[in-house]
């Protein structure tokens, strides 16, 4: 791996609750009571946002840093892949959450954001350059910093020679997440979505959990049973938005069900969205 430094952005789009303003970027750049400043941290680049009373929603930094014209691009996803995780050509409006990779010849380039940022971050890219979007909203409204400084994100970049994409991705993810938060023991067990598809009751859960307990008898690390979409009070085939305050008639006592699972040696889990 060869860490690479970012050049300075050439432009910045600042979005508040009331307006959007494009500004040529000079480090730092100030507009009204908002200042955006970039500071190196080793090979990485930290993005700091300071503001008074103006609610800040998003900071977009544009880098006029040419990329290989015929590269294949793979970007991140917000939650998980839905059959759309792929290497493909440039699509300038394609949203790539957290990171993206470029493959050109025997070289793989990587761009990303360190884990645990203070913003929701995504990238766009084309052969003439790339942008990173830092959404710092608090809920749906701009954050009110009231004189404070927010380290919104730390940007990272690296280059890999003679490395296939999978290897480069694995190495770069270790850079983005140097201190991963891992469970004490492997997480395994059952989830009732991919056979019940939302049509299950407490009796079904207890029957399947009993089979799971028998299959894992004697193991100190006990399995989980995840009660997926099926339990919530307003469960329907065309809607899964809650509320999440109680079970439906098939699940009359959710705390009691969790207790029964624990007593059978199963760790209870629950699905919400």
Positions of PLM-derived features:
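Polysaccharide-binding surfaces and accessory modules of carbohydrate-active proteins
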Residues: 2-120
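Short, ordered beta-strand-loop transition motifs
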Residues: 17-18, 37-43, 124-131, 135-137, ...
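Short low-polarity hydrophobic stretches
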Residues: 47-49, 146-148, 225, 261
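Short, flexible loop/turn elements at secondary-structure junctions
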Residues: 51-53, 65, 117, 138, ...
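Short loop/turn segments at connectors of secondary-structure elements within structured domains
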Residues: 55-57, 146-147, 221
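Aromatic-lined carbohydrate-binding/catalytic grooves of carbohydrate-active enzymes
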Residues: 186-273
């Amino acid at each position: 791996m060869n860490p690479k430094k970012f050049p300075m952005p050439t432009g910045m789009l600042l979005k508040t609750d009331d307006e959007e303003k494009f500004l040529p970027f000079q480090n730092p750049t100030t507009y009204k009571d908002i200042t955006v400043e970039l500071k190196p941290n080793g090979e990485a680049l930290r993005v700091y946002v300071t503001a008074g009373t103006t609610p800040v929603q998003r900071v977009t930094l544009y880098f006029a840093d040419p990329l290989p014209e015929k590269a294949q691009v793979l970007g991140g996803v917000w939650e998980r892949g839905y059959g759309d995780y792929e290497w493909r050509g440039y699509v300038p409006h394609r949203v790539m959450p957290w990171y993206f990779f470029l493959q050109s010849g025997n070289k793989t380039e990587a761009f990303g954001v360190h884990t645990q940022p203070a913003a929701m971050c995504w990238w766009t890219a084309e052969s003439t350059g790339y942008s990173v979007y830092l959404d710092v909203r608090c809920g749906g409204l701009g954050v009110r910093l009231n004189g404070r400084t927010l380290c919104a994100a730390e940007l990272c970049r690296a280059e890999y020679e003679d490395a296939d994409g999978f290897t480069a991705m694995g190495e770069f993810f270790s850079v983005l997440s140097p201190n991963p938060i891992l469970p004490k023991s492997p997480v395994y067990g059952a989830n009732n979505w991919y056979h019940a598809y939302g049509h299950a009751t407490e009796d079904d859960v207890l029957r399947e959990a009993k089979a799971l307990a028998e299959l894992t008898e004697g193991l100190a690390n006990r399995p989980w049973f995840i009660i997926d979409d099926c339990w919530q009070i307003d469960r329907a085939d065309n809607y899964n938005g809650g509320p999440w305050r109680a079970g439906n008639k098939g699940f009359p006592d959710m705390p009691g069900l969790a207790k029964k699972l624990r007593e059978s040696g199963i760790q209870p889990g629950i699905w919400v969205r």
